[in-house]
Amino acid sequence: FTGEVMNDYTWDISMQWHIADYLTNDCCYLQKPEYTEAAEAFKDTGSFRGQDSLFHPDVVAYYTSSPSVTSHSQFRSLEYTIGGPLKMIPDTDFVAGVQSAEYNYENIYDKQSEVGNVGGSSGNSSANSRDYTALFFESKTSLLDGAGELSVAVRSDDYSDFGKNTSWTVKGLYDVMDGLTLRASVGTGFRAPGLGDLAANTTFSADSHIDYVKCAAQGIARPDCPSEQVNTYIAANPNLGPETSESTNVGAIYT
């Protein structure tokens, strides 16, 4: 929805609502308890369920698994902006607004994967939600009879799961002559941690890596250093805060 106020100002109200549901199915993973049962039976008696091979299709079907993940996510937001001339400062336009949003998700793994019975797979069930409110303002001022331009922007976010953060940017342009423009900017930024990083259950994965330090200690040359699997556990950290950054850019545009 859009409109005008006092002929000089425009306003805009926008809404979003996204829902995503999907199911992921995999095939032919090793079901560890059933495989152990079959392997021990062959070791003791030489057969299992009337078959004389651990790799008979009927036996393989017994100890293989088809893990699945059921996922749901929902995002809703409402944003209101207003813009026009900032009359207290000559030759300046502005845009200001407020945004409110809510996001939630869940990834549900099958029960056998959750308890660690599926070999070679990684992942575990997780669910989380957050909401936030943001206030933002941006202005652009024409300077030096149009030869220069100054932009200022500031945004303040208030997240339900890790608190508040404010970021800002100041940019400037100056046309030195026809075809040559100098520009510079300085600012800060941030990125909120992912919901899975904050709340996912601990996940097991058998990752491959090359340990060059170990090979050097054993006198093995780097090209001959073998790859090996290690047990890896990936856990969430509910105490994560936002990633923050500072940036400065200076440059020229020549055409």
How should each PLM-predicted stretch be described?
Residues 102, 131, 136, 140, ...:
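Membrane translocator/pore-forming domains, dominated by Gram-negative outer-membrane beta-barrels
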Residues 1-3, 78-84, 135-141, 170-174, ...:
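Residues on the lipid-exposed face of transmembrane beta-strands in outer-membrane beta-barrel proteins
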Residues 129, 157-166, 244-246:
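Solvent-exposed loop/turn segments connecting transmembrane beta-strands
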Residues 14-16, 97-99, 153-155, 173-175, ...:
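Generic beta-strand/beta-sheet core signal
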Residues 235-255:
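Charge-patterned, long linear interaction tracts outside catalytic cores
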Residues 6-8, 87-89, 144-146, 177-179, ...:
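Outer-membrane beta-barrel channels and translocator barrels
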Residues 7, 11-13, 92-96, 148-152, ...:
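Transmembrane beta-strands of outer-membrane beta-barrel proteins
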Residues 2-132, 187-242:
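Surface-exposed, low-complexity loop segments enriched in small/polar and acidic residues
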